[in-house]
Amino acid sequence: MAETLLKSTTRHIRLFTARVENGDLVPDPEQLTLDLDPDNEFLWTEGTVTTIQTRFRDLVESYAGQPLNDYNLRRIGTELEGSIRELLQAGSLTYNPDCRVMNYSMGLPRTPELL
């Protein structure tokens, strides 16, 4: 029987119960894969990516022993979205002006004129 691929998708986070092999997702019920900001809405630094990756690892650890199901994947994705919002509000993360669509999905940019 083929393994089932579970996934959770938010605006900026995609989680899969899979591993990446040769650029393809291979279902793996023992591993979670994070796809961060697939639409390139933000400009990421190494530090901001590391912050989200660390938060992801912490969340996965905190859910150890719990069922790996849609509900728990959505909870992890929602927590990560909140972390992205915090980085944006702190000024550590900025919108990408070259993004395909500028929709300010997490609110208007924080600039001195708007504060």
From Swiss-Prot:
The lineage of its organism: Bacteria, Bacillati, Cyanobacteriota, Cyanophyceae, Synechococcales. Its main location: membrane. Keywords: Membrane, NAD, NADP, Plastoquinone, Quinone, Thylakoid, Translocase, Transport. Coiled coil: none annotated. It is found in: Cellular thylakoid membrane. NDH-1 shuttles electrons from an unknown electron donor, via FMN and iron-sulfur (Fe-S) centers, to quinones in the respiratory and/or the photosynthetic chain. The immediate electron acceptor for the enzyme in this species is believed to be plastoquinone. Couples the redox reaction to proton translocation, and thus conserves the redox energy in a proton gradient. Cyanobacterial NDH-1 also plays a role in inorganic carbon-concentration. Its EC number is 7.1.1.-. GO terms for cellular component: plasma membrane-derived thylakoid membrane. NDH-1 can be composed of about 15 different subunits; different subcomplexes with different compositions have been identified which probably have different functions. It catalyses: a plastoquinone + NADH + (n+1) H(+)(in) = a plastoquinol + NAD(+) + n H(+)(out); a plastoquinone + NADPH + (n+1) H(+)(in) = a plastoquinol + NADP(+) + n H(+)(out). Belongs to the complex I NdhM subunit family. It comes from Synechococcus sp. (strain WH7803). It is a peripheral membrane protein. This is NAD(P)H-quinone oxidoreductase subunit M. It is an enzyme of class 7 (translocase). GO terms for molecular function: oxidoreductase activity, acting on NAD(P)H, quinone or similar compound as acceptor; quinone binding. It holds the Pfam family NdhM.
